[in-house]
Each structure stands twice: as structure tokens, then as C-alpha cells.
Amino acid sequence: MSYKEEWTPEQRAQADVKCKALSDADTVKTDVAGKRNGTKTSRYRKDNAIPSNQDVDHTIDLQLGGPDDAINMNGLDKSVNRSLGKQINNLIKDLPEGTVLGKFTMK
């Protein structure tokens, strides 16, 4: 995956942390239709005082088999979250459901 040119060192560090978490997890392409519960993310945002410049991120993306549960959520810079989520989607969109994925890297 790629850093955005305009990302700050802090944003790049957040992307690195996310990438490491994905590499350390057992990730598999997963159909996410109907698996996202907006109430859970809204509750997590409120209960954990996530600032407005951050999204509630699934550390292991739902599209990679992560659970839609508070244990898999944290605050992440909006630009980092949305960019990495889209990049992951683009990388896996043509893979068959159930494809096991390995190491994720940033460049």
C-alpha cells in the first residue's frame, strides 16, 4: 500500500501501525454485506471520545475478516483510514472469497 504524499509523519506512523496489525493477523477476503453495524461504531466513538479528525477504524478491516466488535476498533486519522480501506479494497476486489492474505507493506 502507499502513503499519500501530503501525509504528515504522524499519519505515516499511523499507517505503519495499521499495516503491521494487518500483517500480524490472519486475514482473509470476506464479504462484508450486512456485517457493518453503525450503532457499534457510534457507541465506540462516544464511549472512547474519538476526536472529529479521526474515524472509528476496524483494526482488522471487515473486508479482511475482522470482527465488527469494540475489541477490533480504535481511532484512526480519517485520511489514513479512508485511503488504506480503499487501497485494500482495490487490492482484493478481484480475488475469490476466502482468499488468505499475507504480509501488508507500506511504500
How would you name each of these model-derived features?
Residues 1-107:
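Nuclease and nuclease-like effector domains acting on nucleic acids or nucleotide cofactors
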